[in-house]
From Swiss-Prot:
It is found in: Virion; Host nucleus. This is Nucleoprotein. InterPro entries: Flu_NP. Late in virus-infected cells, may be cleaved from a 56-kDa protein to a 53-kDa protein by a cellular caspase. This cleavage might be a marker for the onset of apoptosis in infected cells or have a specific function in virus host interaction. HAMAP family: INFV_NCAP (MF_04070). The gene is NP. A motif (Bipartite nuclear localization signal) lies at residues 198-216. The lineage of its organism: Viruses, Riboviria, Orthornavirae, Negarnaviricota, Polyploviricotina. Belongs to the influenza viruses nucleoprotein family. Homomultimerizes to form the nucleocapsid. May bind host exportin-1/XPO1. Binds to viral genomic RNA. Protein-RNA contacts are mediated by a combination of electrostatic interactions between positively charged residues and the phosphate backbone and planar interactions between aromatic side chains and bases. Residues 1-21 are annotated as: Disordered. Residues 8-21 have a biased composition (Basic and acidic residues). One of its GO terms (molecular function) is structural molecule activity. GO terms for biological process: symbiont entry into host cell; viral penetration into host nucleus. It comes from Influenza A virus (strain A/Memphis/4/1980 H3N2).
């Protein structure tokens, strides 16, 4: 993007930093990882977990959720003011899995939020370390993106389930800050705005009074974040229109859905970061690795190297395939739910299959599931190559895509052409070109019509051997274009609903 100079890098967003040079950024991200690792080690001690139990991803998720809940001030305030039966607003907890007499047992633990906050701050040199909390939120969000398809949420807001490649970060909490905003897809931003406009239509006081002023500034801020993700002038102009509307209503919803559809071909820039579970950082820290001193980046080789040397385990339900569970978590670790599967297969070195072909449910285990025949197995999270994460949508072009997902949102900066199914996308653009935004609409449609299949994105960029830490020898992959490129291909993934 042309305006790169005015943007803070992800790592600065991640660490609330002022302008820092590369070394300082690597150190401050490393410091954040150290803090998560130290916290995790301390929690494993508190919970008396064995080394194996501490490397169980389900335990990691529970511990991460406990600290996120302990620091969720708005929800904590709400719980204090609206006490509900059987829920102690001052406590947090969840299922912890232990190996007892050769069987996996579930144990529900409960801790004072105050105590969890104390352990977290102590692990982070007394700071609240918001960046570390956001990092865990993004890991949970990436896992949700890989596990569930947001069909229902899309339909509810009047969008099309085939637009799922725009929905990165749709389950991120609002309090996830600048780092969270950076990883949200176009569809996620559009959905948040549509929900807001619908509330305004149904509730006369939504935009009024003292609260209404705050609401209005939140609305305009979200419009600006979305505008900043678009890469063409016409799409940005359309966002200005939506933002400046006196009284946002159905016309704005129409414009937003139009711009979301257009993003299937004229893709926006969405950041990608490899956020790993806390049970990866903990053992690395306890083995004596100093992330702050060595430096760390979420968008380079570091997460790949870390995963090459990590042992992570997962509980496996009786009819699940451990290799499929591994693929799910591997994709989540690299924020790659909407990347082209052919490229992922190349980087990973083993075939990456569409969601509907995987015999695995989500990673988390519901409290009513029977533990009797639960097994556990090692997650295979290693890769054959590594590649640099991108925050650009790549330039656009087309190719046969699938019935389920009709476009991709690239994760890796690697040369390829980006598949989307032009006829399907363009079919949605018949009709309505009148009204205030008619000239922008016409311009956007013209650009989409002009998108060429043979165009290559990320020209000259390649993947790298894991020994090539300085990224000196790019290997430009060649793909079998007959293979399916979309993950949510005509899919039957469970829907994510809170």
């Amino acid at each position: 993007m042309a305006s790169q100079g005015t943007k803070r890098s992800y790592e600065q967003m991640e660490t609330d930093g002022e302008r820092q040079n590369a070394t300082e950024i690597r150190a401050s991200v490393g410091k954040m990882i150290d803090g998560i690792g130290r916290f995790y080690i301390q929690m494993c001690t508190e919970l008396k977990l064995s080394d194996y139990e501490g490397r169980l991803i389900q335990n990691s998720l529970t511990i991460e959720r406990m600290v996120l809940s302990a620091f969720d001030e708005r929800r904590n305030r709400y719980l204090e003011e609206h006490p509900s039966a059987g829920k102690d607003p001052k406590k947090t907890g969840g299922p912890i899995y232990k190996r007892v007499d050769g069987k996996w047992m579930r144990e529900l633990v409960l801790y004072d939020k105050e105590e969890i906050r104390r352990i977290w701050r102590q692990a982070n040199n007394g700071d609240d370390a918001t960046a570390g909390l956001t990092h865990m939120m993004i890991w949970h969000s990436n896992l949700n993106d890989t596990t569930y398809q947001r069909t229902r949420a899309l339909v509810r807001t009047g969008m099309d389930p085939r637009m799922c490649s725009l929905m990165q970060g749709s389950t991120l909490p609002r309090r996830s800050g600048a780092a969270g905003a950076a990883v949200k897809g176009i569809g996620t931003m559009v959905m948040e705005l549509i929900r807001m406009i619908k509330r305004g239509i149904n509730d006369r006081n939504f935009w009024r009074g003292e609260n209404g002023r705050k609401t209005r500034s939140a609305y305009e801020r979200m419009c600006n974040i979305l505008k900043g993700k678009f890469q063409t002038a016409a799409q940005r102009a359309m966002m200005d229109q939506v933002r400046e509307s006196r009284n946002p209503g159905n016309a704005e919803i129409e414009d937003l859905i139009f711009s979301a559809r257009s993003a299937l071909i004229l893709r926006g820039s969405v950041a990608h970061k490899s956020c790993l579970p806390a049970c990866v950082y903990g053992p690395a820290v306890s083995s004596g690795y100093d992330f702050e001193k060595e430096g760390y980046s979420l968008v380079g080789i570091d997460p790949f190297k870390l995963l090459q040397n990590s042992q992570v385990y997962s509980l496996i339900r009786p009819n699940e395939n451990p290799a499929h569970k591994s693929q799910l978590v591997w994709m989540a670790c690299h924020s790659a739910a909407f990347e082209d599967l052919r490229l992922l297969s190349f980087i990973r070195g083993t075939k990456v299959s569409p969601r509907g072909k995987l015999s695995t449910r989500g990673v988390q285990i519901a409290s009513n599931e029977n533990m009797d025949n639960m097994e556990s197995s090692t997650l295979e999270l290693r890769s054959r190559y590594w590649a640099i994460r991108t925050r650009s949508g790549g330039n656009t072009n087309q190719q046969r895509a699938s019935a389920g997902q009709i476009s991709v949102q690239p994760t890796f900066s690697v040369q390829r052409n980006l598949p989307f199914e032009k006829s399907t996308v363009m079919a949605a653009f018949t009709g309505n070109t009148e009204g205030r935004t008619s000239d922008m609409r016409a311009e956007i449609i013209r650009m989409m019509e002009g998108a060429k299949p043979e165009e290559v994105s990320f020209r000259g960029r390649g993947v790298f051997e894991l020994s090539d830490e300085k990224a000196t020898n790019p290997i430009v992959p060649s793909f079998d274009m007959s293979n399916e490129g979309s993950y949510f291909f005509g899919d039957n993934a469970e829907d994510y609903d809170n």
